[in-house]
């Protein structure tokens, strides 16, 4: 029985040792639950140490990928190498923005264009790539890009493309022009205000430039390219010559052998030919921009224009001096108031019985007769304006009179005044034609008066109204007395001439033209 006790004791001792060991542990860890929890945590931490480090590396890699994708989608920073590449493609190869965008991955043509504009405008002061001369770096950049990448062509292909583009430009475009011997621009750039000239043209400029002159600035803003294309020539004459060679293409092609002095005097103002109304030919001189001599020439051209317009005053004065003479002569042939019989005068007393009218409208008044011209101008302004309508510019010719006479003789093919006005060349009115016909009839009757006097008396008695026959049949002596009384009333100096007209036939002959005259005054008043 002792053995099991020993065993129990040993077990108990073992248990005690375990308990002692447990107490020693409890001395360090007074709470056994915490001990178990700490063991479990240490075990789990030991197991989970490797997966935590792997997840952190994965998170870092995802962050880098997101940053790279953001950079690819929205590239904000441009490296100096990218700037030099952009300038090389644009300024030397003259590529389009879409073609340039293919050389830069994940960059749009607008972004490339905006970056190039910022480089050329000088806004990027800290960036020195905008100041670098691309022409000098062309060989270095070509050797640096000799290894072809996936998106960029090789340097040999770029040189071939450049040669092909130059051939196409020289063959198909009108950019190559004839110019004076001291200046030969080769290629006209596509955009004058945005591009530099190619390497060949700059080399030709540098050959003609003296060696001691150096450019003040390596970079020129694009606004200056609209006025002068050369980048490294401070000489002003070459810039003016480039403008002239670019704009005056037709004149340069037609005149191949032109002196350089002529090119200095050619401006952009076109040749103006001024023809005045008097057929004076005034060729205006070509006006260059910066000489005082040309300003004097331009002033002389303007003064010649002014003088040509000032000639209008002399024309007006000539018309004004000539105008009063024509209506007076016409008025003398139209208004025949002193020859009217008393019967006709009774019908038109309101028109012709004024003494001022009598002096002014008398056709037989001598030039020595003194009249009040001021009163005439005041009282007869209306008649002057009305008579001016009937003043004919063209006198009657013999051919016109023959047409009218043939019309009066030929009763079968008798034409109306309207038809005669169409036939006559000078666009005469019906009233003028009727007056001329009456005048020709009267002239023919006077010439043939002595042959057929009795027939005319009977015909004219039939033409007179019956009222005038009853009231106005007077003897020639009575008519002459009436005319003498009229002339005494109006103080006419030509009473002797009027008293000599004593025959009734002459008075009736003058009465024949009264209907035409009355119709004229009806139209006037």
UniProtKB/Swiss-Prot annotation:
Species for this entry: Saccharomyces cerevisiae (strain ATCC 204508 / S288c)
Spans annotated as Disordered: 22-82, 283-308, 451-510
Gene Ontology CC annotations of this record: cytoplasm; nucleus; Rpd3L-Expanded complex
Gene3D superfamilies documented for this protein: Homeodomain-like
Protein name from the UniProt record: Transcriptional regulatory protein TOD6
Quaternary structure annotation from Swiss-Prot or TrEMBL: Component of the RPD3C(L) complex composed of at least ASH1, CTI6, DEP1, DOT6, PHO23, RPD3, RXT2, RXT3, SAP30, SDS3, SIN3, TOD6; UME1 and UME6.
Cross-referenced InterPro entries: Homeodomain-like_sf, Myb_dom, MYB_TF, SANT/Myb
PANTHER family named in the record: MYB PROTEIN-RELATED, TRANSCRIPTIONAL REGULATORY PROTEIN TOD6
Gene: TOD6
Keyword Hydrolase tagged: no
Family: Belongs to the DOT6 family.
